[in-house]
A protein has these predicted regions:
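Short active-site neighborhood of thiol/selenol oxidoreductases, capturing the structured segment around
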Residues: 76-98, 104
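N-terminal targeting signals for export/organelle localization
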Residues: 2-63, 67, 202-204
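Structural microenvironment flanking redox-active thiols in thiol-disulfide oxidoreductases
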Residues: 93-136, 146-152
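Short, small/polar residue-rich loop motifs at catalytic or cofactor-binding pockets
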Residues: 60, 83, 162-164
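Structural micro-motif
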Residues: 138-140, 158-168
């Protein structure tokens, strides 16, 4: 009888443990997909998407027109004669995207001296862009691409509505000079400057 009692007790405990496990799982899911954590997960997923087939070097950069967060109208075709950095990033005010934007900010003086125009592109709207730019004193325009039209022209994949982190360097001739299909947010501005300097020297 004792054995039977123990067996019954053990069986009686199992549903309680199972129910507790379900409750714990639900709590974990609620935490993971909260407003604070879910964007970080989506950003990480966007960064981890497989490397796509991007525009080849020497290809004319696809033209586009966009209204930046600061009110200026950006038309790529009118920027010929300048170096243009078009960097796609997943989401405003997330860890990697903030590091990348602040890296451009911290190298802004040097970029300006080299005649480089910088544009950040993501799928958030200009309300989000303004808040992001103001919070971190970003001196360059952020472009809204809520429909993914600019991303599509540059073959940048969207994952969960967020752009993969990819950078295009467009030469003064309006053609693709270099592409970074994967980007380390820290030190990226220096990578771009290092790419521009030898190219500029050859042109001279």
């Amino acid at each position: 009888m004792r054995t039977m009692t123990r067996t019954r007790n053990s069986w009686n405990l199992r549903p309680a443990v199972a129910v507790g496990g379900l409750a714990l799982s639900a709590a974990l899911l609620a935490t993971l997909f909260s407003d604070r954590v879910a964007p970080l997960i989506r950003t990480a997923v966007a960064d981890a998407t497989p490397t796509p087939a991007l525009l080849p070097l020497g290809t004319p950069a696809p033209d586009f027109t966009a209204a930046a967060h600061d009110g200026q109208k950006v038309e790529l075709s009118k920027l010929k004669g300048k170096w243009v950095v078009l960097y796609f990033y997943p989401k405003d005010d997330t860890s990697g995207c903030t590091k990348e934007a602040c890296d451009f900010r911290d190298n802004w003086s040097t970029l300006q001296k080299k005649g480089v125009a910088v544009f950040g592109v993501s799928t958030q709207d200009n309300t989000s862009h303004k808040a992001f730019a103001t919070k971190y004193s970003l001196p360059f325009p952020l472009l809204p691409d809520d429909k993914g039209e600019i991303a599509a022209k540059y073959k940048v994949p969207l994952m969960g509505g967020l752009a993969r982190r990819i950078t295009y360097l467009i030469g003064k001739d309006g053609r693709i000079a270099h592409v970074w299909p994967t980007v380390n947010p820290v030190g990226h501005a220096s990578e771009i400057l290092a790419q521009i300097e030898p190219t500029a020297a050859k042109a001279n």
